[in-house]
C-alpha cells in the first residue's frame, strides 16, 4: 500500500464506487491530506527501573483520506504511514508503520448498515503499555479486522443494533502470543423519555490463541444500563452486568462515562471494569479510569490534558498511569504547531519504572481538493 501513489489510490477508489453505485446517483468525492512532522525526547523508552537511557525520535506521518457520497451511501478510506527514526537504534528501532481504514455505510428510513476493514501496525511499546505492561522489547504488533454493523428502528421508541467482527493480531519480536477473535454484539435501546434511554447489551467473543496446545476461550457479556442527558451540556451513560469465561467462570463488569461541553471547554471521563483479549494468550480483567480536558484559548490556540490509569489482573499483573498535556496553535491557514509533555509510570510483577516524553510537531494540512 505504501508504494501506491495518492493518484492511484484515488483512481481505484473512485472506480470501485462508480461500479457499485447506481448510475442515477450523483457522486460527490472529497479528499484531504496532511503531513505531521515532529521530534520528541523520551527519557526511558524501555521503562527500565534500573538503567534509564534516553533517545530522540524523529517522526513524520503523512495521511490521506478520501470519501464519496452518493444518495444514501458513503464510501471512505484513510491511509497513513508513520515513519520513525531513532537516535539510538539499540533502544528503539527505525519504523515504517502503515495504518489503513476502508469502509462503507448506507442509510434508509429505518435501517443503517456499515462495513469496515482495518489494518494497523505499531510498536508494542505503545500497544502493550496499558494492555500488559510488557514494553522492554521494541517489537511490532499487526492487527487486521473486518466488521459489519446493522441497526434498525423497530418502533418509534425501540431501536435494535447487531454487530460482528473478525480480528487477528500477530507479533514480530518479543514474547507475545498472537490470536484471533470472532465477536458478536447486540443492543436494544428504548427511548423512555427525551432524556433517558435504558438499554440491554449482549456480547459474545471466541478467543483463539496461536500455537499448539493452546485452548480457545469463550467470553459472554450481559449488561443493563442507561444513557441520560442531564442537560443540553452534560450526558452520562452507565451500565453493569456479568461476564462469563469458559475458563474462569463468572465475574462482574461495569462501565460509566460522561461528557460535558461548555462554551469554550469540554470535559470527558470514563470508569470501567472489562474483560478483553490480550497478548498473554488469554483474556484478562482490567480496571480503567480516563479523564480528558480541552480548552479553547482563542480561535487559533487551544490546550488540554489527559489522564489514564489501568490495572490488569492476569498472568502478568500490571498497573499503568499516564498524564499528558498539550498546547496547539494554528500558525497559518494550513500550518499547525503542537507541543506535548507526558509522564508515565508502570508497575508490574518485577518492576516499577517511570519515564517522560517531550515533543513538538508541525503539521501541514492540505485542504479539500
Question: Each predicted region: which residue ranges?
Answer:
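Cleavable N-terminal export/targeting peptides
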Residues: 1-30, 367-369
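Gram-negative and organellar
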Residues: 26-369
Amino acid at each position: 500500500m505504501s508504494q501506491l501513489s495518492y493518484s492511484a489510490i484515488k483512481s481505484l477508489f473512485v472506480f470501485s464506487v462508480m461500479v457499485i453505485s447506481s448510475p442515477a446517483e450523483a457522486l460527490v468525492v472529497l479528499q484531504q491530506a496532511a503531513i505531521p512532522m515532529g521530534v520528541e525526547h523520551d527519557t526511558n523508552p524501555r521503562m527500565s527501573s534500573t538503567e534509564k537511557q534516553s533517545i530522540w525520535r524523529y517522526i513524520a506521518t503523512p495521511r490521506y483520506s478520501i470519501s464519496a457520497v452518493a444518495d444514501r451511501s458513503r464510501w471512505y478510506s484513510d491511509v497513513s504511514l508513520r515513519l520513525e527514526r531513532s537516535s539510538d537504534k539499540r533502544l528503539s528501532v527505525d519504523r515504517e508503520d502503515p495504518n489503513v481504514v476502508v469502509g462503507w455505510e448506507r442509510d434508509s428510513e429505518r435501517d443503517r448498515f456499515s462495513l469496515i476493514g482495518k489494518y494497523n501496525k505499531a510498536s508494542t511499546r505503545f500497544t502493550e503499555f496499558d494492555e500488559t505492561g510488557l514494553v522492554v522489547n521494541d517489537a511490532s504488533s499487526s492487527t487486521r479486522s473486518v466488521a459489519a454493523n446493522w441497526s434498525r428502528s423497530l418502533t418509534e421508541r425501540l431501536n435494535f443494533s447487531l454487530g460482528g467482527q473478525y480480528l487477528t493480531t500477530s507479533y514480530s519480536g518479543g514474547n507475545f502470543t498472537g490470536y484471533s477473535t470472532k465477536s458478536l454484539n447486540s443492543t436494544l435501546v428504548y427511548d423512555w423519555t427525551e432524556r433517558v434511554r435504558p438499554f440491554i447489551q449482549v456480547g459474545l467473543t471466541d478467543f483463539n490463541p496461536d500455537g499448539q496446545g493452546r485452548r480457545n476461550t469463550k467470553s459472554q457479556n450481559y449488561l443493563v444500563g442507561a444513557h441520560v442527558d442531564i442537560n443540553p451540556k452534560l450526558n452520562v451513560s452507565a451500565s453493569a452486568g456479568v461476564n462469563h469465561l469458559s475458563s474462569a467462570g463468572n465475574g462482574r463488569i461495569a462501565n460509566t462515562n460522561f461528557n460535558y461541553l461548555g462554551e469554550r471547554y469540554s470535559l470527558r471521563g470514563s470508569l470501567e471494569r472489562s474483560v478483553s483479549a490480550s497478548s498473554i494468550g488469554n483474556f484478562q480483567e482490567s480496571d480503567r479510569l480516563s479523564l480528558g480536558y480541552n480548552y479553547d484559548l482563542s480561535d487559533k490556540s487551544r490546550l488540554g490534558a489527559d489522564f489514564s490509569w489501568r490495572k490488569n489482573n492476569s498472568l502478568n499483573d500490571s498497573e499503568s498511569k499516564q498524564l499528558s498535556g498539550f498546547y496547539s496553535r494554528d500558525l497559518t491557514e494550513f500550518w499547525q504547531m503542537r507541543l506535548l509533555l507526558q509522564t508515565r509510570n508502570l508497575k508490574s510483577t518485577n518492576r516499577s519504572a517511570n519515564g517522560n516524553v517531550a515533543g513538538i510537531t508541525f503539521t501541514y494540512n492540505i485542504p479539500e481538493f
